């Protein structure tokens, strides 16, 4: 496979030129206007940030991308899917409120916000995974798969489970329904925290395997001989009583995530933009954000999300760590076993290369790229 083109600009702005204009230039240089969007629905997949977190991308960036789509006759909408865990984004009502409180609504972004997997995180489509090794199908939010064109707009950062959070994570994990997220994150089957169960029986009604029973105290329990591990009961519960107890090894998570991303992008026009700024050590899913581990680097865009992530990773690995950060503090510890890898030195119990390896393996793109400065 030939190296892919990745377009890049830094964050330096001469007088009279804003970062929003630089983002627009990078998108155009990378070929966003080559996509036929006329009369088509365009899903712009991004992360709206957990309440309390301030590292997520500003709504102004989303408006630049949405405006470019509308200029080409497209009908864009911002989207993300509900979270597997408790928080402010576990159902569509709370998720929309969170997005609005963080600044994402039509007056600021120029388009609507649609939660991709519906009210409870159960509105999903089972999509074939091309060349899937770990997942033969992926459970993806229906609204995302209904779109004619797919664009990822990613805040590139560190991550406590996957090493870094880039385009592949934004697409693969982010587009998964709650059941899809569980399939990626967990070894299999959910569990019940009895103290939170209200005995409403909603989970039993949602279960297609007749795997949920109730004890004498009217608390739910799961028959693991019948349970298929689909995760739909998690979405059905309004009280966070059903949860995923068993995280897989990080490498398996990384590889499943890459395959989910391949399912989302297969056989339709896709474009990818990543902003490498406010590089926090952990995910924007936290209700806080620690100090950036690296200085702001730039804006990257490409048709190839694998090459895009690799280019962003390389830029981060070549950047100087910031002293007042998780990374800087680790490196300053006496006797620290330095990995000479800014992601592993920030979160030493992770391995980030598997995501890129698996995405390349299933034919989503190539890790080889040519960087073109805009």
Roles of regions detected by a PLM:
Residues 2-61, 71-80, 85-374:
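Extended, low-polarity segments enriched in aliphatic/aromatic residues
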Residues 66-67:
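Terminal amphipathic helices with adjacent charged low-complexity linkers/tails
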